[in-house]
């Protein structure tokens, strides 16, 4: 038995045997199967040590395939141990049925169960091999995915910068439109002030003309008074006196018109003062709003520069 334990798997199976690549448990006794499993366990421990040395370089998919293989081996061992426990429950004097001729008497495992376990083992081994190959291909495809996932944050960062630039452009256009709306009333107020100034100049020119007419009328009135005194001394015609009265009456009417025009000028000047006061209030309000917007814009620019420096670092 000790010499048989030292044999390798190639020595136990003949070279010309048709199932050299796959071990057939139907031609082996229970002791041979146990020895084969011990050798297989030794080889598995050596492979496990090699895998532990290279575990840092292996992908999670290959480790998963190894875990499937290890579970399958434990399942096969349970299958064999359950079969042995079932056979030990039988009486020693009874000859088991379904045994192969020439089979070792210590091998208490029935032929049907041996075939079933062998088929399950081979099928599971092929399945695990296919899974390991698929996991290997999947691990080979993972670098491309990792490169794509690595390039994705850069694209997201670029899209975020573009979105921030678009938002700033929209806010700038809104501010420009608001400034245009605010400047339009200022332009209208300036145009109204120009019209009022032009009206004031016209009224001043009319007032100067009325003053000149008033001086002329005063001069004519003085001349008429001087002629009236001469006529009084010389007892002149009544016709000249009547003409002087008519001229004086005309002067009074012209003076009354001048007073009415002057009153209108005062009313217009008062209206101009009221409108000018309103313009001053609106201009002051615009200046306050503009200073507030400038302060907010400076704060937004400061926050943007701080965020940009944070992203750069």
UniProtKB/Swiss-Prot annotation:
Biased composition (Basic and acidic residues): 34-60, 81-92, 142-168, 199-226
Localization (cell): Nucleus; Cytoplasm
GO terms under cellular component: cytoplasm; nucleus
Residue intervals passing through the bilayer: none
Lineage: superkingdom: Eukaryota
Region (Arg-rich): 51-80
Biased composition range(s): Basic residues: 65-77
Record's keyword annotation contains Nucleotide-binding: no
Motif (UAP56-binding motif (UBM)): 22-40
Residue(s) carrying Phosphoserine: 234
Segments of this protein annotated with the region Disordered: 1-238, 290-313
Region (Interaction with DDX39B/UAP56) location: 1-119
Major location (coarse): nucleus
Record keywords, A-Z: Cytoplasm, mRNA transport, Nucleus, Phosphoprotein, RNA-binding, Transport
GO biological process entries: mRNA transport
Annotated region (RS-containing His-rich (RS-H)), positions in chain: 178-236
Region entry Interaction with NXF1, spans: 241-313
Region Leucine-zipper, annotated ranges: 238-287
InterPro entries the record matches: UPF0353/GerABKA_families
Tissue: Expressed specifically in testis. Also expressed in a wide variety of cancer types, but particularly high levels of expression observed in melanoma cells.
Bias kind Polar residues: ranges: 126-141, 169-179, 304-313
Single GO term (MF): RNA binding
Function text: Export adapter involved in mRNA nuclear export in cancer cells. Binds and enhances the RNA-binding activity of the nuclear RNA export factor NXF1. Can restore mRNA export function in cells compromised by loss of mRNA export adapters.
Subunit structure as annotated in this protein's UniProt entry: Interacts with NXF1, NXF2, THOC1, THOC5, DDX39B/UAP56 and SRRT.
Protein name: Leucine zipper protein 4
Organism: Homo sapiens (Human)
Source lineage: Eukaryota, Metazoa, Chordata, Craniata, Vertebrata
């Amino acid at each position: 038995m000790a010499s048989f334990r030292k044999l390798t798997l190639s020595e136990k199976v003949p070279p010309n045997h048709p199932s050299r690549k796959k071990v057939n448990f139907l031609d082996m006794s229970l002791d041979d199967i146990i020895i084969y499993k011990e050798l297989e366990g030794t080889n598995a421990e050596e492979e496990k040590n090699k895998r532990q040395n290279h575990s840092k370089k292996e992908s999670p998919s290959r480790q998963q395939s190894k875990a499937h293989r290890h579970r399958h081996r434990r399942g096969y061992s349970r299958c064999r141990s359950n079969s042995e426990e079932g056979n030990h429950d039988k009486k020693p004097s009874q000859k088991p049925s379904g045994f192969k001729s020439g089979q070792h008497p210590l091998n208490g495992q029935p032929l049907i169960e041996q075939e079933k376990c062998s088929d399950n083992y081979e099928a599971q081994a092929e399945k695990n091999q296919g899974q390991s190959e698929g996991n290997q291909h999947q691990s080979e495809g993972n670098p491309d995915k990792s490169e794509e996932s690595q390039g994705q944050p850069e694209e997201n960062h670029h899209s975020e910068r573009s979105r921030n630039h678009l938002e700033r452009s929209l806010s700038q256009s809104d501010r420009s439109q608001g400034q245009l709306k605010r400047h339009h009333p200022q332009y209208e107020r300036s145009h109204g002030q120009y019209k009022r100034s032009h009206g004031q100049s016209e009224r001043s020119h009319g007032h100067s003309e009325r003053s000149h007419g008033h001086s002329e009328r005063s001069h004519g009135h003085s001349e008429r008074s001087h002629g009236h005194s001469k006529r009084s001394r010389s007892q002149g015609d009544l016709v000249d006196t009547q003409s002087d009265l008519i001229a004086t009456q005309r002067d009074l009417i012209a003076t009354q018109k001048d007073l009415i025009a002057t009153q209108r000028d005062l009313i217009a000047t008062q209206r101009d003062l009221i409108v000018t006061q309103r313009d001053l209030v609106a201009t002051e309000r615009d200046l306050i709003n503009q200073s507030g917007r400038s302060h907010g814009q400076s704060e937004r620019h400061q926050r943007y520069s701080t965020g940009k420096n944070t992203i750069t670092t």
